[in-house]
Amino acid sequence: MSLIAKIPDILKQAQEEYENCRPGVFDTSYQYGESDTGNIVAEGDNLEFMKFLIETMDMRGKVNLIYVDPPFFTKIKYEAVVKMPATNENISIPAYTDKWEEGEAEYLRMLCSRLIAMKELLAEDGCLWVHLDWHISHYIKILLDEIFGYNNFVNEIVWTYKSGGSSKRHFSRKHDTLLFYSKTKKYYFKPQKRKILQQRL
């Protein structure tokens, strides 16, 4: 079965995962920034945290902007390099894994359940920015169209950069994609004042 044919099941399973997820227990006694701003720094499962915000902190429909930078479906295990002060040696410790036993469908279910939670958190004038790259952004766009509605797609922003090498098998992959969605047509947008100069590629 093709991945496109699995999209309805992925959406259904993600909705069930969101509904069955219990709010995490987070210590809110530590805040970041000015004490009266209500900023929270949290460590834990982000789906459980969003359910905590929705059900415990009563933040449903109160968030104006969400920026999310999920794993890119690279099929790689990532490590962090830490320098040990005593020996001046570098050691590698596991950071996170972007490998998925069930492939694309498992990854899409994981992200889809979280996108559903994000929509619940967004205010009527709220926006969502999803940072991705070439690996799987085309499938995420389909899921976002289903969750937020095709008419609430505002922009695709292409972020180009110069780092990375070249290949003998394909053009260099030197850009990321940001998908910009609104919850409704009431979203806030500040027009760009500075013109973009045309440059030759």
Residue ranges: model-predicted function:
Residues M1-L201:
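Core catalytic lobe of class I
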